């Protein structure tokens, strides 16, 4: 008996005549109305039974099924709320993508810190689960992008004090949740005898609880999770992760009903994809030229009913499972593969296109980290599938079809992102193919396949798909074993966001201190105040002083701390840093002002004013960037400073000079308009409802009420920093430069106020210095510099030409050169004390004459070699260089036709060249 068995013995099950049974196939316990049922109903224990025989009497579209669900729960006392974005890192910092509706309410609502937007509530939340990517297309039921229809209730135990959590008491719990599920099925005309409720305890994120999988006609249509436990080393319940758990004060109904699967159930199509993407599937089939006879179509449908057996989470070998399906269908497995694999690719393309539409529509920009990396991975896999199956429709068109269906307004930006990424991918493949060839040569002739970890690194670092590696490896005699869950393994490397490090141990005195009253929010321009010293912590260097109230701003949100002084009587101490810990502000000082002393504080006013101007200017630059570049632009990081500041934004290409000028123009127009900058502290749910999650450009603040900064009517953000009162106080904003931080993230460096004037003067000084050096007017510097550059390039080309002529002359003249016969081929051994370009040119000249070239140089006090080999000659240049370089204390290598290397021992150069003929002969014989 499991520890949680009692949790599943519901009054509702007893009242409705359910029986608890154990599946003889998988061992799962389940509840059913059917006394004769033996199996749990879930694949692979049972197959899909609704294909060509829908589970509901009426066929629903996606929108119709969504409305039926939400309306049902509205009629049963739930409030409908709008869905959140698929990029969960816009309101939380511990995950990247929204994978379930409960993500919308973690961690603040689920922990009881803030109330839910409604209680109970219902929602249909778009989600993306990267771990399902390898199942998409194969199982007939998996989609990477999906909508999780859900209803939630947030409860606390009655004995808990009312003010301890943001909600109190019980709304409803397990019996009502199962009854709602049953009644929903009944309202849609389902055969209730065919529904099974499988016990499957849930564990995740340090929480746990009983959970029920709801199976109907072979398909899992819902999961009912009852989150009521937390990890506890002294807990009474051991869960499937091996940890023990105990019950919490809060308990939450967390349900998930897959919209796509419910729609599929109502239509009874061969796979979920025909139900979800009917137009896209038809378009892709026609474009790819996929047509089936009536007999082939019947075989495909028969195979579809068994496709649930291909789930990589349940089988060790997908192809072996496909072979078993072929045996059951009495068809050759190769014939089955010919029919279904093109369809599996079609299904995956449709699903991935929808996933990309969600990602780019919600503002994710492709990059090498975080959500941007995941988007890039999906796009590149989709592009590979499109090319393999021979679809000639542009990928941006396929994604746009889904973006239009989803109602996104930024479709032009979405298409441009896709086109830009395709161009980058082509360049990546050109560079990466050479890497794969070298790797394949390394493993060719060995008994070892190219390891999975190497495949993952090739994909991560070079974007090279595993099937491309397999193709190149096969050509060169190497083998590759691509795991069935390859893309899920890639996603696992990037799925988790970086969490905060564990908090340091706290002094008991510190834990007893009250939160510091922050005066700077009441008057951001004020720099003087009075306070009482509550405590002083002595450090190895300096002191941390805690006051009852402060005007000093602590470092946070990319804004440096204020500095200044504290004065107690005749004693004045310098405040050199300010930090905040759990609401307590710590003033780092160079001396002890005395615990219990009354102090006067003086903030450095010039520093504060410059930081205020730069912080508000950061908001202006961000707003201007969205105006100029598009609404997909979001903050990726920021740092305010005294002389300049920077704003990192997510954008898919380099910012042009014209765009920089337009960003400056928009920002300075707001400065000239002198609009008010005001703050407010609204309820979090109300703020999110009114302004959306673009509020959180600089991170997600804690608390039920959050501070919003409004810049006129143009921009609103959650922000804890100090700001000017009106934009006119900034004076001016000047963009100093832009640069790529990483792929998909652009940095805008700018200055505001007096710092902008100083930066402009520094630029002008540099221009005037250049004008004096060139002896021209400052306005003529660009033209003069360009002329000088062209002349310099011309002379460089002349020098290169002369070097080539000299190399040819040396090659033909035989200066310091020895010719030897190596297996019927002439090899030239030559010493030439020139630079690397001269060595390469001379070697190339010999190779052009059909000769093996070994050219050495002792210039600059070291030895270097270049080896060139003509086509068709069985000598490996890389091995020759490696042997020779070792004789001068170094190393080197390269491809078989051209290699270079060297070492520090120039005195050994001649001996190495003398040995070159023997080296060539030994390697040729080997």
From Swiss-Prot:
Q: Name one GO biological process term.
A: alanyl-tRNA aminoacylation
The record's top EC class is ligase
- InterPro entries from the UniProt entry: aa-tRNA-synth_II/BPL/LPL, Ala-tRNA-lgiase_IIc, Ala-tRNA-ligase_IIc_anticod-bd, Ala-tRNA-synth_IIc_core, Ala-tRNA-synth_IIc_N, Ala-tRNA_lgiase_arc, Ala-tRNA_ligase, DHHA1_dom
The protein's UniProt keywords, in alphabetical order, are:
Aminoacyl-tRNA synthetase, ATP-binding, Cytoplasm, Ligase, Metal-binding, Nucleotide-binding, Protein biosynthesis, RNA-binding, tRNA-binding, Zinc
User: Care to name a GO molecular-function term for this sequence?
Assistant: zinc ion binding
Locate the residues binding Zn(2+): 615, 619, 719, 723
Cofactor(s) recorded in Swiss-Prot or TrEMBL = Zn(2+)
> What's any one GO cellular component for it?
cytoplasm
The UniProt catalytic activity note for this protein reads: tRNA(Ala) + L-alanine + ATP = L-alanyl-tRNA(Ala) + AMP + diphosphate
Per its UniProt record, what SUPFAM superfamilies does this chain match? Class II aaRS and biotin synthetases (SSF55681), Putative anticodon-binding domain of alanyl-tRNA synthetase (AlaRS) (SSF101353), ThrRS/AlaRS common domain (SSF55186), Translation proteins (SSF50447)
Disordered: region residues: 887-910
Kindly give the Pfam families that the UniProt entry links to this protein. DHHA1, tRNA-synt_2c, tRNA_SAD
Give the enzyme's EC designation: 6.1.1.7
Q: Where is the composition biased (Gly residues)?
A: 888-904
| Entry coiled-coil feature ranges | none
Q: Has keyword RNA-binding?
A: yes
Q: Relay the cofactor remark from the entry.
A: Binds 1 zinc ion per subunit.
Which Gene3D superfamilies does UniProt cross-reference here? 2.40.30.130, 3.10.310.40, 3.30.54.20, 6.10.250.550, Bira Bifunctional Protein, Domain 2, Threonyl-trna Synthetase, Chain A, domain 2
Its primary localisation, in coarse terms, equals: cytoplasm
HAMAP family from the entry?
Answer: Ala_tRNA_synth_A
NCBIfam families listed in its UniProt record: A-tRNA_syn_arch (TIGR03683), alaS (TIGR00344)
The job of this chain, per UniProt, is described as:
Catalyzes the attachment of alanine to tRNA(Ala) in a two-step reaction: alanine is first activated by ATP to form Ala-AMP and then transferred to the acceptor end of tRNA(Ala). Also edits incorrectly charged Ser-tRNA(Ala) and Gly-tRNA(Ala) via its editing domain.
Domains: what does the record tell us? Consists of three domains; the N-terminal catalytic domain, the editing domain and the C-terminal C-Ala domain. The editing domain removes incorrectly charged amino acids, while the C-Ala domain, along with tRNA(Ala), serves as a bridge to cooperatively bring together the editing and aminoacylation centers thus stimulating deacylation of misacylated tRNAs.
Give the family from UniProt: Belongs to the class-II aminoacyl-tRNA synthetase family.
Q: What is this protein called?
A: Alanine--tRNA ligase
The record lists the organism as Halorubrum lacusprofundi (strain ATCC 49239 / DSM 5036 / JCM 8891 / ACAM 34)
């Amino acid at each position: 008996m499991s520890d949680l068995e009692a949790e599943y013995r519901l009054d509702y099950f007893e009242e409705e005549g359910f029986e608890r049974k154990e599946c003889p196939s998988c061992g799962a316990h389940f509840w059913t109305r059917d006394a004769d049922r033996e199996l749990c109903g879930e694949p692979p224990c049972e197959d899909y039974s609704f294909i060509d025989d829908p589970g509901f009497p009426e066929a629903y579209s996606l929108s119709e099924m969504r409305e039926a669900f939400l309306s049902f729960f509205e009629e049963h006392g739930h409030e409908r709320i709008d869905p959140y974005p698929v990029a969960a890192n816009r309101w939380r910092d511990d995950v990247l993508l929204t994978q379930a509706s409960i993500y919308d309410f973690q961690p603040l609502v689920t922990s009881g810190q803030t109330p839910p937007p409604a209680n109970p509530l219902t929602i249909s939340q778009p989600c993306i689960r990267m771990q399902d990517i390898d199942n998409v297309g194969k199982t007939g039921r998996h989609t990477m992008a999906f909508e999780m229809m859900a209803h939630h209730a947030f409860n606390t135990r009655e004995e808990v004090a009312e003010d301890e959590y943001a909600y109190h008491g019980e709304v409803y719990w397990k019996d009502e949740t199962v009854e709602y599920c049953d009644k929903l099925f009944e309202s849609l005309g389902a055969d209730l005898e065919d529904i099974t409720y499988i016990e499957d305890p849930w564990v995740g994120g340090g929480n746990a609880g009983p959970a029920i999988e709801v199976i109907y006609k072979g398909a899992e249509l819902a999961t009912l999770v009852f989150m009521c436990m937390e990890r506890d080393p002294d807990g009474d319940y051991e869960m499937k992760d091996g940890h023990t758990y105990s019950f919490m004060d809060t308990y939450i109904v967390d349900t998930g009903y897959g919209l796509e699967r419910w729609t599929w159930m109502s239509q009874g199509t061969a796979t979920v994809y025909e139900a979800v993407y009917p137009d896209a599937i038809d378009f892709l089939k026609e474009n790819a030229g996929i047509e089936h006879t009536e007999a082939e179509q019947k075989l495909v449908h028969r195979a579809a009913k068994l496709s649930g057996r291909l789930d990589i989470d349940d089988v060790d070998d997908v192809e072996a499972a496909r072979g078993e399906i072929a045996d059951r269908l009495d068809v050759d497995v190769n014939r089955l593969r010919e029919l279904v694999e093109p369809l599996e690719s079609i299904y995956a393309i449709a699903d991935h296109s929808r996933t990309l539409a969600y990602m780019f529509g919600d503002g994710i920009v492709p990059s090498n980290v975080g959500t941007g990396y995941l988007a890039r991975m999906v796009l590149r896999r989709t592009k590979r599938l499109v090319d393999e199956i021979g679809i000639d429709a542009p990928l941006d068109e396929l994604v746009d079809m889904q973006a239009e269906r989803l109602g996104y307004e930024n479709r032009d930006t979405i298409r441009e992102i896709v086109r830009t990424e395709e161009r980058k991918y082509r360049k990546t493949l050109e560079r990466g193919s050479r890497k794969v060839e070298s790797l394949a040569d390394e493993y060719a002739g060995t008994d070892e396949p190219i390891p999975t970890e190497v495949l993952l690194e090739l994909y991560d670092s070079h974007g090279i798909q595993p099937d491309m590696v397999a193709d190149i490896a096969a050509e060169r005699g190497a083998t590759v074993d691509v795991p069935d869950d390859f893309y899920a393994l890639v996603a696992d490397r990037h799925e988790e966001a970086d969490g905060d490090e564990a908090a340091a141990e706290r002094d008991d005195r510190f834990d007893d201190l009250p939160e510091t009253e922050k005066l700077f929010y009441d008057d951001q321009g004020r720099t003087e105040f009075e306070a009482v010293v509550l405590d002083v912590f002595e450090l190895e260097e300096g002191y941390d002083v805690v006051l009852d109230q402060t005007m000093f701003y602590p470092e946070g949100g990319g804004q440096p701390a204020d500095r200044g002084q504290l004065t107690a009587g005749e004693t004045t101490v310098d405040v050199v840093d300010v930090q905040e810990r759990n609401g307590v502000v710590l003033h780092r000082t160079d001396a002890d002002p005395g615990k219990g002393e009354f102090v006067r504080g003086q903030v450095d006013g010039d520093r504060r004013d410059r930081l205020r101007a730069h912080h508000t200017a950061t908001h202006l630059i961000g707003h201007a960037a969205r105006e100029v570049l598009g609404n997909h632009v979001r903050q990726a990081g920021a740092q305010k400073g005294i002389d300049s500041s920077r704003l990192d934004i997510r954008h898919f290409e380099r910012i042009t000079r014209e765009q920089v000028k337009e960003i400056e123009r928009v920002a300075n127009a707001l400065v000239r308009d002198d609009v008010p900058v005001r703050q407010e502290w609204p309820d979090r749910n109300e703020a999110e409802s009114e302004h959306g999650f673009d509020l959180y450009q600089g991170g997600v603040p804690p608390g039920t009420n959050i501070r919003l900064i409004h810049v006129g009517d143009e921009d609103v953000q959650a922000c804890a920093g100090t700001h000017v009162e009106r934009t006119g106080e900034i004076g001016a904003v000047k963009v100093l430069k832009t640069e790529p931080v990483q792929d998909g993230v652009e940095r805008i460096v700018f200055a505001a106020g007096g710092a902008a004037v100083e930066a402009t003067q520094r630029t002008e000084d540099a221009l005037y210095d250049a004008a004096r050096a060139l002896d021209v007017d400052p306005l003529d510097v660009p033209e003069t510099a360009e002329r000088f550059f062209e002349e310099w390039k011309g002379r460089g080309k002349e020098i290169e030409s002369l070097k080539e002529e000299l190399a040819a002359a040396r090659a033909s003249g035989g200066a310091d050169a020895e010719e030897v016969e190596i297996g019927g081929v002439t090899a030239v051994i030559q010493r030439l004390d020139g630079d690397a370009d001269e060595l390469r040119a001379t070697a190339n000249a010999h190779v052009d004459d059909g000769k093996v070239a070994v050219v050495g140089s002792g210039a600059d006090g070291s030895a270097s070699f270049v080896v060139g080999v003509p086509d068709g000659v069985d000598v490996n240049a890389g091995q020759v260089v490696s042997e020779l370089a070792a004789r001068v204390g170094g190393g080197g290598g390269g491809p078989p036709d051209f290699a270079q290397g060297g070492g520090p021992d120039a005195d050994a150069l001649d001996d190495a060249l003398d040995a070159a003929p023997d080296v060539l002969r030994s390697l040729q014989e080997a």
